[in-house]
Amino acid sequence: MKTDYKPRIADRLLSRKLAGKGAVLIEGPKWCGKTTTAKQQSKSMLDLGDSGVLKQSLQMMDISPKTLLLGDTPRLIDEWQTIPPLWDSIRDEVDKRREFSQFILTGSSVLPQADETIHSGTGRFAKIKMRPMTLFESGESSGIVSLRELFNGKSIEPLACGTDLRDIAYLTCRGGWPMATFLSGDIALDQAFDYVESVVERDIQRVDGVKRNAERARILLRSYARNVSQQVSYSTIKADMLSNDSKTLDEDTVADYIKALKKLFVIEDLAAWNPNLRSKSAIRTSDTRHFVDPSIGTASLGLGPDDLMNDLDSFGLLFEDLAVRDLRVFAEALDGKLYHYRDSSGLECDTVLHRRNGTYALIEVKLGGEKLINDGVSALKELASVIDTTRMPKPSFMMVLTAVGQYAYQRPDGVFIVPITCLRD
């Protein structure tokens, strides 16, 4: 099968980071395209994902570590974390050369010793987190609505971008795995199932050398999927697991498995936003549970597109997982981060895109339909009304991001209604 490279938003981030640092570390889940993206800008490569190369490199590390770093620059060190001492060698080499764009490192897990090592690279290394493809990157979004332009104050005339809900169900189950975007039908859907199987059978054992039960990892992923896009505690997840796991299970065990899955970049929870408010409501600080890609949730539950169409409540939560994936990628391209908001009065906002310059946008995520859209608009306007604009700016814009809709448009009250298949960074 011939595959052409589909440009990634990370291409721009990598180019920018290389221009100002001696080395750039690209992290993210396996199969998300880190190595392929790095190859577009590297001039030589050390492929430690190849067992033969790894064996020889381990021997060379004892004799002459510097030899592994020789080659045209930027030099790509793929799966660097398999030889953690390489980090110090690269850091020292960057100090010695005193030049930018020397090394690109990629890794799909964080080993304990590597985790400690990473902190020693301050100032020499930049970090980029890659995720599976957004719909814009995979070609399923036209990109006619730009978040950057909305932040710059641009309004939009009604733009046609019709989407079929069944197509969104398929894209949710397929996920943004680059290889899957070149495939179709059930063959494309298989990729997510293969990914989950690889994680529970191999990766969760190898990430830190701790022996874990594959079936328990499966049960945890299923419990996480049932609670995706919700602010639930570990104790709630444990209770859900116990209904499917007759073995003794404590909260520490649940936390250990979740920590391992976070190190593998499988799970990526959404932190709470903490704005200045005029109200006395207490802000809830619990994370919202999310996967790095919604297909992990659907595959863990054994769901396909038809299953989502027959259970719109679950579909809505898994679609929110997809929207969070895309918005996180877009946020990083805009020097921003994504958060969620919820307070003691029950007021909530699915996502808040907060940029480094202090500007932010409030974004609700809905499947679509007049009632759900109106509910989203009401929540956005209520949250905007309690933000203390004497201490922080008002939102740059508010948006309801939908799965379906014939048009992207701006309502008379200023709120944007945008189908996700129209959106880009």
Predicted regions mapped to residue ranges:
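Conserved lysine of the Walker
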Residues: 34-35
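Short glycine-rich substrate-engagement loop in P-loop NTPases that contacts/grips substrate
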Residues: 45-74
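Conserved catalytic/switch belt of AAA+ P-loop NTPases
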Residues: 87-111, 119
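Interdomain motor-coupling "hinge/lid" segment immediately C-terminal to the ATP-binding subdomain
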Residues: 115-230
